[in-house]
Each structure stands twice: as structure tokens, then as C-alpha cells.
Amino acid sequence: MIIDDEIYMIQNRNDEVSAYYSDQVIPSWDKFGYYVNMFDCVYPDTLHEYDYLDFGQYWGLRDMSEGEKAGWYSHTLLWIKCAMENKDIAIIEHDVECVAPLDFTERGLNFFCCYENN
């Protein structure tokens, strides 16, 4: 499966931390020859433009924050793009570094996660 030019990074250029991380990790994608399309996230103050998700409660314990809802809408907009265009895409966050060539052996959702908490 080839998705070399269909990688979308969700970023918030209005947020100093998000901009910092995306600027830091983009060279790692360039190193492996990937072009990353920058996708400007849904902002909490623009949530009123979106009303098609029902969030309920987070783990049944609390309401989701406006930032969490905006994150879900950002991903959902890209999933809709994927379905409407019938294209395979990769969706990454602003702080995802590419450390090796991507290998998507199956169609569908592939999750690559690495959480390091030091």
C-alpha cells in the first residue's frame, strides 16, 4: 500500500508548543522521503461549526474538554476525507517523529503508537 503523499499531520499553528513540535519532527519525515500535508486542527472556539458527534462522558466519569472534542473532530474530518476520496491516508499528530520507513501491509486502520514516559 503506497501512501507516500497522503500523510496528514494535525497541527495547531496558533499554539506555540504544537508549532514547536511539528517544526522539530518534520525533518524526520523528510529524511525518509515522505511529504507531510499539514492539516490545521479544529479549534475549541470553532466547535460550534461542528455538531455531528455525540461525545457522552469520558470513561463515564467526566465530560470531555473542548480541546478533546476539537481533537476528535480534527481526526474525524480526515477520516471523512479518506472515505470520500477512497484513498489510503496516514493521520499523525504534531509530535510524531518518523524513525523508520512506514509499512502498511493491510488496508484499514493501522495504529502505530509508542509512549515513553520518563
Q: What residues fall within each predicted segment?
A:
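An acidic/histidine-cluster motif and surrounding catalytic segment
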Residues: 1-92, 96-118
